[in-house]
Amino acid sequence: MIIDTPEVQDINSFSRFESLQEIYGIVWMLVPILTLVVGITIGVLVIVWLEREISAGIQQRIGPEYAGPFGILQALADGTKLLLKENLLPSRGDSPLFSIGPSMAVISILLSYSVIPFSYRLVLADLNVGVFLWIAISSIAPIGLLMSGYGSNNKYSFLGGLRAAAQSISYEIPLTLCVLSISLLSNSSSTVDIIEAQSKYGFWGWNLWRQPIGFLIFLISSLAECERLPFDLPEAEEELVAGYQTEYSGIKFAFFYITSYFNLLVSSLFVTILYLGGWNMSIPYIDFLPLFEINNVGGIFRTTTELFITLAKTFFFLFISITTRWTLPRLRMDQLLNLGWKFLLPISLGNLLLTTSSQLLSL
């Protein structure tokens, strides 16, 4: 016997309403994540095109010009080509490690974007330990590279993975000490709070002027973490064929290619956040952006303006990184390790001690 009273109908309707609310909440949670991933992917495509154009200008040659207007779709064409290629596995390699390595590298870098504020309202997760979460997550990527090198059953790949791990350890410590100095100055480890602490005096309030030594060390260490020339020892073509990427093809090789540019973009964004005031207009004593928050249209205009300012500062450092790659020669492995352990580490530690002393004296 089925009882169908008004009370039972109300309970069923309420249950369906709760289920719809849960589905709506899940969809609403996924929308910003997917938007962030799509935006980052478009940004990487633009960076690849810019690098090809800038390198062509430096080398006095013609860059990509056939795939789309001015060759702007060349990176998309390369990605499509890699997607359609056969995915080969080494005959005597470790298949699980060989397959997990690229995924671990790209996912760890993607997670770093969750704590990056592109504007005051465009941040996926404003955490109290945002900058240190970025350091912790990004340090997982070299483990994926080491797994890829070991799983390839190739001496060149394994040497490339070992170099990636050694390089990451050498430059992660100075980079962390520089971030710790910024946290002491800002009295917070939140990326949003660090930007707000630089907003009072315009560009004179940037941490660049208060931490010039830390800025240089952070810039060098971030380039080394991205494995860009002159720090691309893990994939040196003349020595290791292609390093840990030697045995890869198809979409897995594309993962490494994407990871490199994801890492480059996130490093440039953190230079902007930690040292250049993030989304702030940087005009001393003048902040007219809050005036646009009279209505929703004004709020959208302010968010768009802050996003543009953040990306403009970021792409300035991307230009420096790209120019550095095509103008400086590669270091030897001993020179790279000596630079990290004998120079950057002591200087960054001294910078942290000076910052701590100045903060204690100002109390």
UniProtKB/Swiss-Prot annotation:
Matches recorded under InterPro entries = NADH_UbQ_OxRdtase_su1/FPO, NADH_UbQ_OxRdtase_su1_CS
For this UniProt record, the keywords arranged alphabetically read as follows: Chloroplast, Membrane, NAD, NADP, Plastid, Plastoquinone, Quinone, Thylakoid, Translocase, Transmembrane, Transmembrane helix
Q: Transmembrane residues, as ranges?
A: 30-50, 98-118, 129-149, 165-185, 253-273, 303-323, 336-356
EC number(s) stated in the UniProt entry for this protein:
7.1.1.-
Q: Catalytic activity, per the record?
A: a plastoquinone + NADH + (n+1) H(+)(in) = a plastoquinol + NAD(+) + n H(+)(out); a plastoquinone + NADPH + (n+1) H(+)(in) = a plastoquinol + NADP(+) + n H(+)(out)
Which membrane topology term applies here? Answer: Multi-pass membrane protein
Q: Which GO terms describe its biological process?
A: aerobic respiration; photosynthesis, light reaction
Q: Which Pfam families match?
A: NADHdh
Q: Which positions carry the signal peptide feature in this UniProt record?
A: none
Location in or out of the cell: Plastid, Chloroplast thylakoid membrane
Q: Name one GO cellular component term.
A: chloroplast thylakoid membrane
- Major site of localization recorded for this protein: plastid
List GO molecular-function terms, semicolon-separated.
NADH dehydrogenase activity; oxidoreductase activity, acting on NAD(P)H, quinone or similar compound as acceptor; quinone binding
Q: Which NCBIfam families match?
A: PRK06076.1-2
* Quaternary structure and interacting proteins, as annotated: NDH is composed of at least 16 different subunits, 5 of which are encoded in the nucleus.
User: What's this protein's function?
Assistant: NDH shuttles electrons from NAD(P)H:plastoquinone, via FMN and iron-sulfur (Fe-S) centers, to quinones in the photosynthetic chain and possibly in a chloroplast respiratory chain. The immediate electron acceptor for the enzyme in this species is believed to be plastoquinone. Couples the redox reaction to proton translocation, and thus conserves the redox energy in a proton gradient.
Q: Which family does it belong to?
A: Belongs to the complex I subunit 1 family.
Q: What is this protein called?
A: NAD(P)H-quinone oxidoreductase subunit 1, chloroplastic
Organism annotation: Pelargonium hortorum
What gene, per UniProt, encodes this protein? ndhA
